[in-house]
């Protein structure tokens, strides 16, 4: 191994002068070794584990991958930058804090605190060294106490809140340092009656009023009377009063679980009180979950042809991809935050259901076509739901209307298997509007009772006089729809809610929508929302055109619309406020209709269209002023003008749109032409730019930052517009570089808080990349593909590596360090990465409100008719949409005889013992077929055993001395192992008799043929990647440097062909002689279609995106053997002594490998342990097997720092140490990672190189290419002192321990059992093979060949061309030869076929 710090540092120092070093260079080498480890020893280039014949070579033995690399290209070394950045950058400090919602503080203690300052979401404070400018720029954090749920019921609270928000923030407030509100667990008692939480809230409010008498000057008597009154009502009534802002608590008559039927079913609860009918639904955010995905067709913008894409609906963005396995490179995106509607398209043939649908946004309409009408409806519903959510802030829906406003209730059967009725309600006394609310009950009895109850309430309500016209009051306008309106839809928002002191009898909910979520980085939107009315006269026609297009959509689509920028009139701009610095910088802002808001003292006017005429409706407001009267007079004048010009509005809107946009474009070209030229020249010149804080930077480094704040904000807005990112995504740095895929593509790299993005800049290219930082495992520097360029490799979880090239080394190094810093910061962010602090507060407030309502329901009186709830949230779940679900029981009705066939070392057998123990618990009869020396170990666990020929030690010696499957390996194996392979095949055939299911390690070579002869399902299970993928290279062909997805994929194809050609002759002879099968080849066997079970953790080797469905990474199959094992006294005393001395303990063991010079290896271990100043538990294991007999003894005296053991269970031993160093076998690597300790791997052969790279990529260990004192001592010191590595290893260990690999594997077997059976029968029918010569009891001999033909039609494979040819030839052969099945004669274990 190269000295990974000193070499990198020397190279960096040669590139950077002492007078000027970049930020990345100053922070790159923050951690350093002790002085004793900085100097290389004489053996720095030696490798004491290499065979003697290869010590003279530069890199030791020649493996197969090295010969492949010499044919492709030789690339340079890379520098390990992981865990070398102790100091965080300024940009990192801004985003390291994360909201914490869990607290150890009891809930009642937090509620009783002051709701004005004490109840809040805790956000860890930034370091005290943060600059004052950053404090001034920090976004104000609103506490939960400002949410309406926690406000004291005092007059003027809203105005006080406004004053408080207007005052400057001198520093961290008291609320920023207090504990958050924890999530309450459900009580575990048998009774549903929980503790009276609401009563504690009453006490809290009483305590608040006594502590703050100036805010509520009430007498003590009044307070006591208020508390006594509140104590007389139920907690549910008080909670509903707070949620819906009733003036007094109203007795809850009845409660029902039902759904509000709009464009989608909103599951929630209906509460019938003495005066109101209320509905509440909780809609939690699920921003990181893919809502819906699948193949649909999309029509081009100019090309009417429909092209098939893979679509993914996630968060607020609908993305489509040409390749579903390449989800980081979208072909396009549709930002649904600016969506208007989603609806089915009317089919031309009325007799057929439509498969076409469309999505309308504020700038164009997208047309789609699904495979079926059902799929189209599902997509429309999902899109409508997202649009509905994006148009309404908050996470809960509240609807409330007075009972006296109800006109009638009538049944309306709309949903099958459900009771649905319609409630018609008068909106208010000021209008003639009548609203219709549809409620669906999936319990018919509850629906009938609710219907009868509401009918009875209406009959007992005095008749109302029809509402008449009234003058326009001073109130905030709300849009109206055909069914329901915005002022009846209240989605709880975390921003300030305006508390209404005077109530009218309205059908709307009293909870008013707060102001929209602001964007601190968007001066354009702030200016739009705070401008005045006077420059909106030119643009009103444009808004009317938009409204006209909206109202022309279908009714179901219009019901989900609630956006203020669409339905309310344009707000007012003054030309003086419009400056060049706040000009619209992208299409979204130029096309977006300005929003209206009430937080700046202006009331918007909404337009409502009823038939062919336009009319204005208004809602409540609290203040009157001269400014408001002037505003309404201007509105009245505008009404007269609009009434006469409405027929021409759409044409005028189009003309005004073109005119305004033409002016803006001409002004842009006139004023920005020189800037455009400068940008283009700067683009080709390359470079980099940072967007963090500039305090404390050197003058030379300030040149990397934008000159003005406006420029920085404009760049961030453009970045978000390019990639359809949320307003909270903050750009950190940008670089110009080449992205290498098929060809180098020039473009721009963007690094933000949570994502790494790339956008091509070449004309005619539209490549975009959006890569979440949590999917990045590592970043490494490489040499560039082009001369004079510098490479950067991004290692992605479950995906092939990405290659970037920079024209300057400084830019490449800066990008690498910035990415490492962002990766470190991203680990501490919450999973919902797209939520701002305000949105997070709103989410938590909604959760608290929902939780308190659930507590109040449980505390409700038993006399109330409480029905079981539908669900905790209003999310609609599809049936059986998760492949991991357990709705259907796949377990066979009868127990199976299962044989596990494997060869190799102890680590190859141990996972199958664990799997067989799980199968035993399921009632099956497992058997392990392997080498005879493992029989006592297998039978000790109660598992049947069958012997297989072969000596694992001899095979291991061959692998170590020649490398895995190199030319020398194949040459010696051909000369010495031909007889061994024949014996292996024959013994495996005997061992697998009388089996119903076969699970085999593919290294055994015989299983797929045996399953074909026995006509039984066949699975493969292995400890290393064996299936074709672009994400990882074949475990036996790991290159020294990253070579990309194409190389990775070809290693599997090449290995399959080389491996098969080496054994094909012997296997085909064995098939014909013993199995009675015809000769075969790779096309007929289709090994890449076999169900595969990988027994390693998906946290260690994430499933690649291009794995097929039948390939599953189940998790480690661990075998716990420490329960009945007692450690020797000497070992226990050694561990205790090391802990008392304060020394780190490491485990060093190279089991299952063979070395030619055990003495030199032992000496290297001793000197490395002493130099690193650690304590060592040494396990020799198989290190000297087949070597000199004297090597079984200790060659040199071991110092007291080292304690040698013969063997110990890994699960016990690794829990006692601080780091582990071993050969990197799959089982040992899994055990050390499961224990959560840093792992040092010195690979010798096979998959050990693969797992060594994985450990390095995950940042949980070190992979050593060579083993000597210099390298090993540094690795031991790093593994025991690097905090980043230690923390990562602990986190990975927790994830692995939470997995149950055996249970997952058994469920996967059950699910794919039928598929595996069909696949085996297909291969058998091709070989013209009837049932096995020794058929199992589950198979009947009288089954004819017609079953085989039917089986062939059950499965359709999509893959390579050669794979597609096989099913076709199979069907042709089966049809033509169904009546010509050869007869069979059984002689012992050999089947002789007569020619047909």
Swiss-Prot record:
SMART domains, per database record: GRAM (SM00568), PH (SM00233)
Keyword presence, Mitochondrion: no
List of residues binding UDP-alpha-D-glucose: 905-906, 908, 1208, 1210, 1223, 1227-1228, 1247-1248
Region (Disordered): 1-21, 40-64, 83-196, 209-232, 460-532, 571-627, 1324-1346
Record-level GO cellular component terms: phagophore assembly site membrane
GO biological-process terms attached to the record: autophagy; carbohydrate metabolic process; lipid glycosylation; protein transport; sterol biosynthetic process; sterol metabolic process
Enzyme class (EC, first level): transferase
Pfam families referenced in this protein's UniProt entry, alphabetically: EryCIII-like_C, Glyco_transf_28, GRAM, PH
Start-end of Low complexity biased regions: 186-196, 1324-1343
Alphabetical list of InterPro entries matching this protein: ATG26_PH_GRAM1 (IPR048066), ATG26_PH_GRAM2 (IPR048065), EryCIII-like_C (IPR010610), Glycosyltransferase_28 (IPR050426), GlycoTrans_28_N (IPR004276), GRAM (IPR004182), PH-like_dom_sf (IPR011993), PH_domain (IPR001849)
Membrane topology: Peripheral membrane protein
Domain GRAM, chain residue ranges per copy: 238-273, 717-783
Cellular localisation: Cytoplasm; Preautophagosomal structure membrane
EC number: 2.4.1.-, 2.4.1.173
Reaction it catalyzes: a sterol + UDP-alpha-D-glucose = a sterol 3-beta-D-glucoside + UDP + H(+); ergosterol + UDP-alpha-D-glucose = ergosteryl 3-beta-D-glucoside + UDP + H(+)
Polar residues bias (residue ranges): 484-532, 571-584
PANTHER family for this protein: STEROL 3-BETA-GLUCOSYLTRANSFERASE (PTHR48050:SF25)
UniProt function note: Sterol glycosyltransferase responsible for the glycosylation of ergosterol to form ergosterol-glucoside.
Free-text comment on this protein's domains from its UniProt entry: The GRAM and PH domains are required for the localization of ATG26 to the preautophagosomal structure (PAS) and are involved in autophagy.
Protein family (similarity comment): Belongs to the glycosyltransferase 28 family.
Name of the protein in question: Sterol 3-beta-glucosyltransferase
Biological source species: Emericella nidulans (strain FGSC A4 / ATCC 38163 / CBS 112.46 / NRRL 194 / M139) (Aspergillus nidulans)
């Amino acid at each position: 191994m190269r000295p990974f710090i000193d070499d990198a540092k020397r190279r960096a120092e040669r590139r950077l002068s002492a007078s000027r070093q970049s930020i990345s260079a100053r922070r790159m080498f923050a951690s350093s070794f002790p002085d004793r480890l900085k100097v290389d020893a004489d053996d720095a280039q030696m490798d004491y584990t290499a065979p003697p014949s290869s010590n003279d070579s530069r890199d030791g033995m020649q493996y197969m991958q090295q010969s492949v690399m010499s044919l492709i290209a030789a690339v340079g070394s890379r520098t390990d930058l992981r865990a070398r950045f102790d100091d965080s950058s300024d940009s990192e400090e801004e985003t390291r804090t994360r909201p914490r919602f869990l607290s150890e503080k009891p809930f009642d203690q937090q509620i009783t605190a002051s709701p004005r300052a004490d109840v809040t979401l805790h956000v860890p404070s930034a370091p005290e060294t943060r600059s004052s400018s950053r404090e001034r720029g920090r976004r104000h954090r609103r506490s939960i106490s400002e949410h309406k749920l926690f406000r004291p019921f005092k007059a003027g609270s809203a105005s006080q809140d406004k004053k408080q928000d207007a005052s400057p923030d001198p520093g961290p407030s008291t609320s920023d340092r207090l504990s958050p509100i924890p999530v309450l667990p459900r009580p575990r008692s048998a009774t549903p009656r929980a503790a009276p939480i609401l009563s504690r809230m009453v006490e809290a409010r009483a305590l608040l009023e006594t502590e703050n008498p100036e805010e509520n000057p009430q007498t003590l008597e009044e307070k006591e009377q208020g508390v006594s009154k509140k104590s007389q009502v139920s907690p549910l009534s008080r909670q509903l009063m707070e949620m819906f802002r009733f003036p007094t608590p109203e007795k809850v008559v009845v409660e029902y679980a039902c759904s509000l039927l709009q464009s989608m079913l909103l599951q929630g609860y209906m509460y019938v009180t003495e005066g109101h009918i209320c509905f509440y639904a909780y809609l939690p955010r699920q921003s990181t979950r893919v809502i819906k995905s699948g193949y649909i067709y999309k029509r081009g913008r100019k090309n009417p042809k429909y092209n098939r894409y893979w679509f993914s609906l996630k968060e607020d963005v609908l993305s489509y991809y040409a390749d579903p396995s390449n989800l980081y490179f979208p072909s396009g995106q549709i930002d649904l935050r600016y969506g208007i509607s989603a609806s089915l398209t009317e089919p031309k043939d009325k007799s057929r259901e439509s498969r076409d649908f469309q999505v309308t946004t504020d700038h164009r309409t997208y047309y789609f076509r699904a495979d079926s009408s059902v799929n189209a409806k599902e997509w429309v519903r999902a899109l409508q739901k997202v649009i509905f959510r994006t148009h309404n802030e908050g996470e809960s829906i509240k609807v409330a209307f007075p009972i006296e406003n109800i006109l009638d209730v009538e049944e309306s059967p709309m949903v099958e298997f459900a009771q649905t009725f319609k409630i018609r309600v008068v909106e208010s006394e000021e209008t003639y509007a009548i609203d219709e609310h549809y409620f669906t009950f999936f319990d018919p009895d509850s629906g009938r009772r609710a219907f009868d109850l509401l009918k009875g309430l209406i009959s007992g309500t005095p008749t109302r006089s029809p509402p008449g016209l009234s003058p326009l009051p001073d109130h905030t306008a709300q849009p109206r729809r055909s069914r329901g309106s915005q002022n009846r839809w209240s989605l709880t928002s975390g921003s300030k809610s305006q508390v209404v002191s005077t109530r009218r009898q309205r059908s709307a909910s009293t909870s008013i929508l707060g102001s929209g979520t602001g964007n601190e980085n968007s001066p354009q939107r702030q200016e739009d929302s705070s401008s005045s009315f006077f420059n909106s006269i030119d643009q009103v026609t444009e808004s009317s055109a938009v409204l006209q297009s909206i109202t022309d959509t279908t009714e179901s689509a219009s019901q989900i619309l609630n956006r203020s920028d669409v339905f309310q009139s344009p707000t007012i701009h003054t030309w003086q406020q419009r400056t060049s610095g706040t000009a619209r910088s992208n299409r979204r802002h130029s096309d977006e209709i300005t929003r209206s808001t009430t937080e700046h003292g202006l009331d918007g006017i909404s337009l409502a269209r009823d038939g062919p005429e336009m009319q204005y409706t208004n809602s409540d407001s609290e203040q009157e002023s001269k400014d408001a009267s002037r505003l309404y007079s201007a509105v009245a004048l505008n009404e007269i003008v609009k009434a006469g010009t409405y027929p021409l509005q759409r044409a005028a809107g189009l003309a005004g749109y073109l005119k305004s946009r033409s002016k803006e474009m001409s002004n842009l070209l006139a004023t920005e032409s020189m800037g455009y030229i400068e940008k283009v020249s700067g683009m080709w010149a390359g470079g980099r730019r940072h967007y963090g804080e500039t305090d404390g930077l050197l003058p030379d480094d300030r040149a990397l930052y934008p000159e003005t704040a406006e420029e920085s904000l404009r760049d961030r807005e453009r970045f978000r517009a390019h990639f359809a990112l949320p307003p909270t995504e903050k750009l950190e740095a940008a670089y110009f570089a080449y992205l290498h895929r098929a060809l180098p593509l020039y473009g721009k790299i963007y690094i933000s808080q949570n994502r790494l993005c790339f956008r091509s800049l070449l004309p005619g290219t539209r490549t975009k990349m959006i890569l979440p930082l949590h999917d990045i495992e590592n970043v490494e520097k490489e040499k560039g593909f082009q001369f004079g360029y510098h490479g950067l490799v991004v290692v992605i979880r479950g995906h092939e590596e990405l290659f970037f090239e920079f024209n300057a080394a400084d830019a490449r190094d800066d990008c690498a360090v910035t990415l490492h810093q962002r990766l470190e910061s991203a680990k501490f962010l919450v999973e919902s990465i797209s939520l701002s602090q305000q949105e997070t507060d709103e989410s938590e407030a909604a959760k608290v409100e929902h939780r308190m309502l659930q507590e109040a329901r449980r505390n409700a009186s038993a006399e109330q008719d409480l029905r079981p709830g539908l669900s905790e949230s209003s999310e609609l779940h599809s049936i059986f949409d998760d492949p991991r679900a357990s709705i259907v029981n796949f377990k066979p009705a009868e127990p199976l005889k299962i044989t596990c066939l494997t060869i190799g070392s102890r680590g190859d057998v141990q996972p199958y013992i664990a799997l067989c123990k799980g199968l035993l618990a399921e009632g099956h009869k497992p058997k392990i077929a392997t080498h005879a020396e493992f029989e006592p170990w297998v039978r000790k666990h109660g598992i049947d055993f069958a012997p297989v020929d072969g000596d694992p030690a001899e095979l291991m010696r061959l692998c170590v001395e020649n490398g895995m499957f190199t030319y020398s390996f194949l040459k010696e194996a051909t000369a010495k192992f031909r007889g061994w392979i024949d014996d292996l095949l024959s013994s495996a055939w005997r061992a697998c008799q009388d089996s119903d299911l076969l699970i085999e390690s593919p290294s055994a070579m015989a299983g797929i043929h045996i399953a074909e002869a026995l006509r039984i399902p066949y699975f493969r299970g292995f400890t290393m990647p064996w299936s074709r993928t672009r994400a990882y290279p074949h475990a036996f062909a790991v290159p020294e440097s990253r070579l990309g997805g194409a190389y990775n994929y070809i290693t599997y194809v090449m290995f399959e062909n080389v491996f098969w050609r080496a054994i094909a002759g012997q296997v085909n002879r064995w098939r014909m002689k013993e199995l009675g099968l015809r000769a075969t080849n790779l096309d007929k066997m289709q090994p890449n279609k076999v169900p595969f079970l990988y027994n390693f953790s998906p946290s260690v080797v994430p499933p690649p995106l291009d794995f097929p469905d039948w390939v599953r990474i189940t998790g480690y199959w661990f075998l716990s053997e420490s329960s009945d094992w007692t450690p020797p006294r000497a070992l226990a005393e050694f561990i205790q002594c090391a802990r008392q001395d304060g020394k780190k303990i490491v485990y060093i063991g190279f089991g299952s490998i063979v070395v030619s010079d055990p003495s030199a290896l032992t000496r290297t271990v001793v000197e490395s342990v002493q130099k690193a100043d650690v304590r060592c538990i040494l396990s020799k294991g198989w290190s000297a097997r087949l070597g000199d007999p004297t090597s079984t003894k200790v060659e040199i005296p071991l110092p007291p720092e080292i304690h040698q053991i013969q063997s110990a269970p890994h699960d016990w031993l690794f829990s006692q140490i601080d780091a582990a160093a071993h050969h990197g076998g799959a089982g040992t690597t899994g055990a050390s990672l499961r224990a959560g300790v840093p792992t040092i791997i010195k690979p010798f052969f096979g998959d050990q190189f693969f797992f060594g790279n994985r450990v390095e990529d995950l940042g949980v260990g070190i992979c050593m290419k060579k083993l000597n004192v210099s390298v090993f001592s540094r690795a031991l010191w790093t593994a025991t002192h690097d905090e980043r590595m230690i923390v990562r290893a602990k986190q990975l260990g927790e994830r692995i321990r939470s997995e149950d690999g055996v249970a997952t594997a058994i469920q996967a077997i059950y699910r794919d059992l039928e598929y595996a059976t069909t696949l085996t029968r297909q291969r058998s029918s091709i070989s013209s093979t009837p049932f096995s010569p020794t058929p199992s009891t589950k198979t009947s001999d009288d089954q004819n060949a017609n079953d085989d033909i039917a089986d062939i039609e059950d499965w359709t494979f999509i893959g390579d061309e050669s794979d597609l040819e096989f099913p076709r030839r199979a069907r042709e052969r089966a049809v033509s030869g169904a009546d010509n099945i050869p007869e069979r004669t059984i002689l012992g274990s050999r089947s002789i076929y007569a020619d047909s």
